[in-house]
């Protein structure tokens, strides 16, 4: 199908929800926008998915997330890993919780148990969780440092790292073979929970993660010397780090931790930042002001 055929298919097929169709009706007179949304499938590359949020085959939405997850599920099933399950985490971006749920429910419908964090968590904790739980794979819904209109989907393997060759290309091949949305499996959350295929994870993993972090300290005696007086300024950039970073610093005894108040809470719009990238010195303007 060409891009107009795809556009009409999404408008007319009963598989797609009314909200999606209404979004597409609003661009009926914008040929360039229709083409951009439908001229290709959102590429599933070595890093997973990443794209602008919206309706269309070339956008991040519940349907492209389901399609990618079905491909990953097919690969897991061929590897005999269904019994191990998949751990899923997500960040503070628009629709991250919804995309995480869609991935979990697709996995569950394929007979693969999904362990889903009860709220946003940083990516390293996802890596820790999937190893701790003995999962075969992990998914993080995040677009890292991209602008607010983006979201993404990263795949991790049982070693806790992002998938590498040859697995990455094998998973890509499975995703590309999912060409019919009607073949993508899903189920309700209530049914998945009742079947034991959807399980929330949270505090128990947090505790274990914090304890493991403490084991990585190279010079604990130095922390004891300076913890009472050292002043630390921290900013989570509206993302996932606020709770875990403050928690580990408190548990280590640091008494003077100052979090940038304007950037403390999760905010999918990244309101105080032009570009939410810690490699950009300008992103630390508020933190440096607080420090001074």
List each language-model region with its residue ranges:
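Conformational gate/switch positions in structured elements
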Residues: 46-48, 146, 236
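An N-terminal, well-structured beta->alpha segment
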Residues: 7-103, 192-229, 240
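N-terminal small/polar loop signature for handling phosphorylated ligands or for N-terminal nucleophile
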Residues: 87-150, 253-292
């Amino acid at each position: 199908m060409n891009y107009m055929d795809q556009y009409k298919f999404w408008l007319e097929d009963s598989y797609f929800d009314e909200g999606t169709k209404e979004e597409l009706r609003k661009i009926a007179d914008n040929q360039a926008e229709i083409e951009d949304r439908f001229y290709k499938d959102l590429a599933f590359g070595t890093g997973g998915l990443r794209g602008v949020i919206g309706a269309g085959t070339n956008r991040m939405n519940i349907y492209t997330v389901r399609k990618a997850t079905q491909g990953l599920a097919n690969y897991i099933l061929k590897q005999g890993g269904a019994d191990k399950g998949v751990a899923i985490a997500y960040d503070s971006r628009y629709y991250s919780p919804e995309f995480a749920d869609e991935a979990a429910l697709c996995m569950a419908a394929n007979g693969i148990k999904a362990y889903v964090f009860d709220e946003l968590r940083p990516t390293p904790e996802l890596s820790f969780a999937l190893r701790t739980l003995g999962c075969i794979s992990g998914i993080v819904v995040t677009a890292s440092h991209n602008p607010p209109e983006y979201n993404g989907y990263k795949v991790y393997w049982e070693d806790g790292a992002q998938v590498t060759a040859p697995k990455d290309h094998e998973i890509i091949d499975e995703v590309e073979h999912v060409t019919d949305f009607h073949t993508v499996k899903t189920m309700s959350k209530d049914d998945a929970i009742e079947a034991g295929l959807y399980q929330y994870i949270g505090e128990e993993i947090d505790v274990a993660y914090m304890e493991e972090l403490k084991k990585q300290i190279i010079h604990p005696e130095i922390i004891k010397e300076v913890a009472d007086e050292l002043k630390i300024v921290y900013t989570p950039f509206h993302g996932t780090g606020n709770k875990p970073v403050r928690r580990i610093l408190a548990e280590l005894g640091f008494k003077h931790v100052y979090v940038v108040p304007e950037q403390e809470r999760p905010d999918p719009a990244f309101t105080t930042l032009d570009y939410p990238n810690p490699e950009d010195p300008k992103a630390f303007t508020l933190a440096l002001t607080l420090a001074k």
